Amino acid sequence: MVANFNPSVGSFVWVEDPDEAWIDGEVVQVNGDEIKVLCTSGKHVVTKISNAYPKDVEAPASGVDDMTRLAYLHEPGVLQNLHSRYDINEIYTYTGSILIAVNPFRRLPHLYSSHMMAQYKGASLGELSPHPFAVADAAYRQMINDGVSQSILVSGESGAGKTESTKLLMRYLAYMGGRAAAEGRSVEQKVLESNPVLEAFGNAKTVRNNNSSRFGKFVEIQFDEKGRISGAAIRTYLLERSRVCQVSDPERNYHCFYMLCAAPQEDVKKFKLEEPKKYHYLNQSKCLELDSINDAEEYHATRRAMDVVGISTEEQDAIFSVVAAILHIGNIEFAKGEEIDSSIPKDDKSLFHLKTAAELLSCDEKALEDSLCKRIMVTRDETITKTLDPEAATLSRDALAKVMYSRLFDWLVDKINSSIGQDHDSKYLIGVLDIYGFESFKTNSFEQFCINLTNEKLQQHFNQHVFKMEQEEYKKEEINWSYIEFVDNQDILDLIEKKPGGIIALLDEACMFPRSTHETFAQKLYQTFKTHKRFTKPKLARSDFTICHYAGDVTYQTELFLDKNKDYVIAEHQALLNSSSCSFVASLFPPMSDDSKQSKFSSIGTRFKQQLVSLLEILNTTEPHYIRCIKPNNLLKPGIFENENILQQLRCGGVMEAIRISCAGYPTRKHFDEFLARFGILAPEVLVKNSDDPAACKKLLDKVGLEGYQIGKTKVFLRAGQMADLDTRRTEVLGRSASIIQRKVRSYLAKKSFIVLRNSAKQIQSVCRGYLARSVYEGMRREAAALKIQRDLRRFLARKAYTELYSAAVSVQAGMRGMVARKELCFRRQTKAAIIIQTWCRGYLARLHYRKLKKAAITTQCAWRSKVARGELRKLKMAARETGALQAAKNKLEKQVEELTWRLQLEKRIRTDLEEAKKQESAKAQSSLEELQLKCKETEALLIKEREAAKKIAETAPIIKEIPVVDQELMDKITNENEKLKSMVSSLEMKIGETEKKLQETTKISQDRLNQALEAESKLVKLKTAMQRLEEKILDMEAEKKIMHQQTISTPVRTNLGHPPTAPVKNLENGHQTNLEKEFNEAEFTTPVDGKAGKSAAERQIMNVDALIDCVKDNIGFSNGKPVAAFTIYKCLLHWKCFESEKTNVFDRLIQMIGSAIENEDDNSHLAYWLTSTSALLFLLQKSLKTNGSGATQSKKPPASTSLFGRMAMSFRSSPASGNLAAAAEAAALAVVRPVEAKYPALLFKQQLAAYVEKMFGMVRDNLKRELSTLLSLCIQAPRSSKGGMLRSGRSFGKDSPAVHWQSIIDGLNSLLVTLKENHVPLVLIQKIYSQTFSYINVQLFNSLLLRKECCTFSNGEFVKSGLAELELWCCQAKEYSGPSWEELKHIRQAVGFLVIHQKYRISYDEIANDLCPVLSVQQLYRICTLYWDDSYNTRSVSQEVISSMRTLMTEESNDADSDSFLLDDDSSIPFSIDDISSSMEEKDFVGIKPAEELLENPAFVFLH
């Protein structure tokens, strides 16, 4: 596939390996046309250059999703790409428009979820990762857009996953074209549910697959002109009939036989069945059970599927009767009869099975035996009965079993088709072909011959399609392709089906001659095709022949060719079963018409060829799409990739043939930018001089001397081998460049070493010179220091001698002066102490007297109070014992609390009286103390005078003898009284202490009672609150019940939020019809009027409503940031008492007006205005409306306390200032919002307003999402520079700058924010809009990142990161309005952060999961890590240890179906409630709002002033 490959030493190549098919290595030696390769396994291989293929060393480690993008399109390159993708669970790969699916042998539910189908809906082929959904979507879109029917051909060998792929395709087509099931099951459901029935009767275990389809199936999904599924049909081809009678070990027969043997016991008895090993048709193989299949459960599942497709229970029993009869017929053995060449049932066992089979088929036992053992030959003259020998009878038995099973299978297909329902008038169809793949076994019989013929025909169709695609590619790129030749397999088809002279024609000819055998047939083939290049005779074979198919040589054994080719029903069998008393069995063998009896010879081969021609005619009228299924290993286990096996399947599936066709033209196709980025180093001057990419590519190729290439409009087309030649030259340039770089680096390192050495020498010299200079300087410093020390020491000694002398003199003087001062101080202290002692003694005596009096009074008072308190305590205890439960007697408890409060107040008054008495006594004691002090002062004055007089007298008078005191008795009396008073005071002090203790105890008891009373009061408040809440709930439930009752009994048309009604106003009044005279409250018209006056009043009211609607239906602006329309509507409804009216049509007209106003869903400004108006009106209704007396504004407050203590506590808690402010605010709010009694129409109006708020919120949010959706697809992938690298000077992006798309997103966010702010949308709604929008951005960017491999690159991560930085800046600037929106981008932020981090291979899994990307799941991390490739620095992704850890974790979580999903879901729910809107506004915000000026001029709206 690669011509002119000239490897050099150092080139990397692929060489053949007996174990791995192909192995890579490095060329270490070139000898002429031979090279020596060092393989990655470590061994050396010598091979010819023609047997080696170049390896692309720059291919991504995770492979490419489209193999046409491979640098080298050859076998080892394709195999390596599939292997790389299979290792990371990327089981789907494109080859152009062909999808290759490698069976993972494990469940991957995340790849097939409904969310994944939504991702592929409308995406062009190749835009997202390869997937069957992409193929199905491309077929569906092409059918709708081009008006051409489509077909999807699914092929592969047994076990490759064809059936599962077909199911996925049908699921997606049902998703795209399915209609809502109004009655019963839809067409697509019936098609999908018919699979279990067909699998039960058409699938079996083979060597390579446990559930292999042994028939071909073509499902036609029919569509109408609108693209909806209108019908379907299933066509089957070549059921393997011989499997019914012949089963090779270790295969199994069809599943239905084993299911029936494992059926419930009553069914087993009814059909007289035993274990499978007892039946000849089943025990030819030792494999009777499968580990992965429970036959009993499958039996019930098949029964249920039959019910779904419309097969009745009677028909099901008849079907399984035929299946059981086949098993019994297989157990009939024959022995030689009495006559020559005759046969009879061998033994009683055979007779039993014969009888049972006759009973199950409802036919005569003897007639069944005769049909098996005899033949009737009709001649002109007579009828001859011929007996059959045992061998012939056995063949007759097997022929009957095969024809019965074949007819049964055909009946099932017809029944399914009739149940599904075909649309013969359908406009288009999409056909899904599930056909067997190319087969080559050790023994190949007639079935393999037909299967391989089918694959040859389909391969020719496939080759023509690939050729056509190549032509379209060349035409699209406008290159010359007329001289290109492609390989065709028409010669093989002529060999097989040419008439006359083909193999099938010769086989039919042999079947028409009774004496022909397989040996004569083989000899005929040898003679006819001995010179044919595709036909050979194997050595030592007498009846085998070999055909050289496109996928390889297959040797066929002709032993059973003639028997298997005969397509006729033995007349005896036909007559027997047609006469069956069972209508079902008789319908399988209808009587043959005279034309069919006299028709020409018919064979399986001819009939199959006709079916094949019919199929190809259908395919030729459709646009084909191809899916090639690959089985990675024969063990049917996950994680095993067998190169040789897969390579053979690629050849059999035609993939390699398609590659050969591509290689016949231009196998290598590179976009200009990729080509220049890779090979620009071959001619850098060309890139600098040329700004035109095609011209630069042409000059580069001309410079390197390549010929035969083509320059298209967007790509460079290279012939086979030219890419390898360019890579060889590139390797040489890189080698020379590496040598130059090494030389420069070594020169740089030598210079650097010299400079370092020179600098080191300079530093050493500098250090030495510095050391010498510092030594000299140190000596000079020491000499100067010695002189300073000597000078300072002498000065110190002189100063010390002087200081000692001076201190001695001062000490002597200080001692003398201190002694004199101390004597004077001692005298003064003694005098002052005497005065203080006298003062304290006198004061103590006075205080002692006062305390005695005070203690005596307090003791008396406390004794009395404690007596009274103990009495009260006894009463309270008695009352407490007699008091019942708190809830049952709350009125008594309140009374007791009031009494207790009164007692506490009484104690407080007593305590106050005591304090007043204390104050009076203290005042008296103070006054007496003052009198005593005054007397003391007078006495002191007299004493002083007496002392002075005595001194004077003593100085003047002579010495007199002392005279004794005469009044000694008086002194003794005073002393005794003093002692009595002291004893009395001490006793009073003791009593006072006891009284204080009792007082403390009494106070503690009183405090405990007070606490108990407070707790009781709080419990009462809580109970009342709970009771009030229950009452409110009961009232709300009664109101809802009333609303529901009125809704059920109401008969007129209800209003629709999306499309309001247009019926006349008079007949539409919230579900009721009434006279206009009764619409409004009678209080509105207080003056008695007659009928005419009442009618005029009603008309005036209608005119007022019209005036209101005409005014508010347009944008009338805002007042103080609040919508004037909402306030005006609310005031009018409040004044007209509409909220309290049982029947009114005002609300219906307002709803109709709002619905009409928001019909334009694209005008965000208009929607924002009405969003603000309706939310404000909803807030006013929420605050105003109440049901059955429970006001909305009071529902959240606890009930007011009715007890005396409760009222006292509330008065203590609230201050006068706060009460005045609250009263003022409440009064202002009540001036705007007034609680009213709401009736049913008002409550319904409130619900409709809430629905409109949610609808308008969703419309504004969805408008922003739609605006951003187109920009997000441009923001996920960085634009590629046309010539990449650093070979060309940078140029400005202009209008295509990467920042333009992100700036457009910012502009869109700003534009909407300005609109919302201008219309005063509540802040909570703005934050929710942006929060959900950022969540949508996160979902779209993250899912696109995980679905597109080209987005998981380093440069793309930097591009998206810069855009996210712009969004973060916007969030910071609009923080008040964006709220937590930035946090919604956590998934894409962490994913992009991982893409741009360096040295990923050094990061452990714990660091990734815990530090870098804690939000991402292991499936998401695994997806990013495996898809990542560094397009800037060519660095590696994470290590294999990290990948292995992720795989282990995913395997552990594989039991959870949702755990495998790596995509995010967009949340379109309404993220707020009415309470959120209410919490964002306050009643006082509406104070001072001016009503609509237009209405103020209307006399009917005077109340608005």
From Swiss-Prot:
Q: Which CDD domains match?
A: IQCD, MyosinXI_CBD, MYSc_Myo11
Which gene produces this protein? XI-2
Report domain Dilute positions: 1148-1452
What keyword terms does UniProt attach to this protein?
Answer: Actin-binding, ATP-binding, Calmodulin-binding, Coiled coil, Cytoplasm, Motor protein, Myosin, Nucleotide-binding, Repeat
Protein name (database record): Myosin-6
Organism of origin is Arabidopsis thaliana
> Domain notes, please?
Head-neck domain associates with cytoplasmic (transvacuolar) F-actin in areas coinciding with the tracks of fast organelles.
Subcellular location, record wording: Cytoplasm
* Recorded superkingdom: Eukaryota
Q: Which biological process terms from the Gene Ontology are attached to this UniProt entry?
A: actin filament organization; actin filament-based movement
Q: Spell out the GO cellular component terms annotated for this protein, sorted alphabetically and separated by semicolons.
A: cytoplasm; myosin complex
Organism classification, top ranks? Eukaryota, Viridiplantae, Streptophyta, Embryophyta, Tracheophyta
